[in-house]
């Protein structure tokens, strides 16, 4: 089954601490989770590894967020939108539900 949200899509967060924030999807995992740039920032306490010449400290990085808390952002209409699928020339493509425009 094709996913409605893919890597490099611009999404908006629907619920939680980051509600209303937008970001670009960096990675999608099989358990229905995604990493979005600038969203769900956590602090990781990293130990130094002298053998690999890595310094320790507190590192801020993006953590996973469930896909059900995200929706795709339609930049043409400047609002959150839903996704449907259509078959065009024998190919299954994603389209916005509000205006029927294809998503690249």
Curated annotation (Swiss-Prot):
Listed Pfam families: ribosomal_L24 (PF17136)
Highest rank taxon of the organism: Bacteria
Transmembrane domains' residue ranges: none
GO CC annotation, single: ribonucleoprotein complex
One of the protein's GO biological processes: translation
Molecular function terms from GO: rRNA binding; structural constituent of ribosome
Assigned keywords, A-Z: Ribonucleoprotein, Ribosomal protein, RNA-binding, rRNA-binding
Keyword RNA-binding: yes
Biological role stated in the UniProt entry: One of two assembly initiator proteins, it binds directly to the 5'-end of the 23S rRNA, where it nucleates assembly of the 50S subunit. One of the proteins that surrounds the polypeptide exit tunnel on the outside of the subunit.
Family of the protein in this entry: Belongs to the universal ribosomal protein uL24 family.
Subunit structure: Part of the 50S ribosomal subunit.
Protein name per UniProt: Large ribosomal subunit protein uL24
Lineage of the organism: Bacteria, Pseudomonadati, Pseudomonadota, Gammaproteobacteria, Candidatus Palibaumannia
């Amino acid at each position: 089954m094709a996913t409605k949200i893919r890597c490099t899509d611009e999404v908006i967060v629907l619920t939680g601490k980051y509600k209303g924030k937008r970001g670009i999807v960096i990675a999608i995992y099989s358990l229905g989770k995604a990493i979005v740039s600038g969203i769900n920032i956590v602090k990781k306490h990293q130990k130094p590894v002298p053998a690999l010449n890595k310094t320790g400290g507190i590192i801020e990085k993006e953590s996973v967020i469930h896909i059900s808390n995200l929706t795709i952002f339609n930049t043409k209409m400047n609002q959150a939108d839903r996704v449907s699928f259509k078959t065009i020339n024998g190919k299954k493509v994603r389209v916005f539900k509000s205006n029927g425009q294809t998503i690249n």
